[in-house]
Amino acid sequence: MHIMEGYLPPEWAAFWYVFAIPFLVYGALRVKRIIEEKPSMKSLIAVSAGFIFVLSALKLPSVTGSCSHPTGTGIAVVFFGPAVTALLSAIVLLYQALLLAHGGITTLGANTASMGVIGPFVGWIAFKLLKNVNFRVAVFAAAMLSDLVTYVVTSLQLALAFPSSAGVAGIIKSAATFMGIFAVTQVPLSIIEGVVAVMLVSYIFEVRSDVLEVVKA
């Protein structure tokens, strides 16, 4: 879903920066508070960021001006919520843009909005709704939906910037086209990501019982 450097018109690039920045500021404040209250969570924050980096670096080519890959944000969503996930995602996306030529600086706001803000927020809502019903299902849903919704948002971002024709109908048609292209790879990838997230969370709970108490609270 990394929209490449220079692909978005300047007005849309600026819009998504303005959209994303408040979430990053709040995320930074949340990280500061978590570390002050529970210094032992530093390692878990690092693991969550590492998971985002590794999975989002596994890319498959796409003809949309973007690419397909897991997002890795589900773990951070489960452990820390959407605000912290937004900050960690932005840091990963910035690193990838500068050093790996994935995404870009002009499109950092748009990529952060999709992968770091909106996708994780939907995943977090699903986790909150399901965690008292079946915790493993809740983790799976959080990771899977964080991934899928990211690509829905990316499709909308591309459609808004490049509608097939003037008006709402052109935007809808373009969005449907982009989603159809992404779906070929992203539906199976999101399911796999959900399974991997459940396995990793289960392992972390085995070695860090204190985390289980915090997450299930």
From Swiss-Prot:
Keywords: Cell membrane, Cobalamin biosynthesis, Cobalt, Cobalt transport, Ion transport, Membrane, Transmembrane, Transmembrane helix, Transport. One of its GO terms (biological process) is cobalamin biosynthetic process. The chain crosses the membrane at residues 8-28, 44-64, 74-94, 107-127, 139-161, 181-201. It is a multi-pass membrane protein. Pfam families: CbiM. GO terms for molecular function: cobalt ion transmembrane transporter activity. Coiled coil: none annotated. It is found in: Cell membrane. Part of the energy-coupling factor (ECF) transporter complex CbiMNOQ involved in cobalt import. HAMAP family: CbiM (MF_01462). NCBIfam families: cbiM, PRK08319.1. Forms an energy-coupling factor (ECF) transporter complex composed of an ATP-binding protein (A component, CbiO), a transmembrane protein (T component, CbiQ) and 2 possible substrate-capture proteins (S components, CbiM and CbiN) of unknown stoichimetry. Belongs to the CbiM family. This is Putative cobalt transport protein CbiM. It comes from Archaeoglobus fulgidus (strain ATCC 49558 / DSM 4304 / JCM 9628 / NBRC 100126 / VC-16).
